[in-house]
Amino acid sequence: MLSVEEFRLLVSRLRGNVKFLYFHLMGEPLLHPELPLFIGIAKENGLVPVLTTNGTLLGRAGAVAEALPHKIQISLHSHEGNCNGGLQNYIGEAMKFALDASSRGTIVVLRLWNRGGRDSMNGEIESLIESYCPQPWVERYDGWRLAENIYLEYDNLFEWPDAERDEYDCNEAFCYALRNQLGVLVDGTVVPCCLDHNGDVCLGNLFERALDDILSSPRAKALYDGFTRHEAVEPLCRRCGYMSVTKRFRK
């Protein structure tokens, strides 16, 4: 588990290079006992903290709301995918948290990123949400604005990268990896995107090297230049459903 001292060091090496700090790269951030402190450290260093959670622990996350992260994304689609408990209680806890956090100024995004997959419960989820945030809702390009600082967002299901699966057969590829995101694992490993939770595309270690040095490495530059040409040069990228969904980048 990442210590406070280690987190401070990583933040110091990200400061000035990134704007948003997402507690997001696999795992459940609400499991970390120092998360409220981490949020404060990020803000002290001029970073904008954003959380992504599966929502199962929101009933005991009051201290997180009090820490005032910029945004919290709740992946409601994880319930149907993992069959965790009763839907009504799950949505109830999520909505109570959303109403509390949003009233403090935090943006809350309720995510249903399961279109084309396990989405049979979406209608029931929407009805439960409506009991906490009554209509009318304001339509947006990616979903709805439900209330002040509360949004419902949809997206298509995609296959996560898997080094063991076959490569996708696609004529062109694209990804925002190293364009507007990178990832740092708990051991300091820098990866190009938030989907590489195993560190298969290790670009360097932030505990050992400066971020500028890591991003200027031959491997990092080859990945970036490859996607500029709409080509996935890394084997893991060629096995990722996100880069192959080219329509995603033509909205």
Task: Give a label for each model feature.
Residues 29, 56-58, 77-81, 113-118, ...:
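Short, solvent-exposed loop/turn segments at secondary-structure junctions
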Residues 18-20, 179, 201:
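Structural motif
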Residues 9, 96, 127, 131, ...:
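Charged/polar, solvent-exposed surface patches and flexible loops
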Residues 100-193, 231-246:
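A C-terminal junction/extension of Radical SAM enzymes
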Residues 1-141:
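Conserved glycine-rich "GG(E/T)P / GGGxP" loop and the immediately following alpha-helix
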Residues 190, 195-251:
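Flexible mid-to-C-terminal extensions adjoining Fe-S/redox cofactors in radical SAM and related proteins
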Residues 2, 58, 175, 203-206:
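Short clusters of hydrophobic/aromatic residues that line enzyme substrate/ligand-binding pockets
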Residues 26, 187, 203:
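Short glycine-rich loop/turn motifs that provide flexible caps or phosphate-binding loops at active sites
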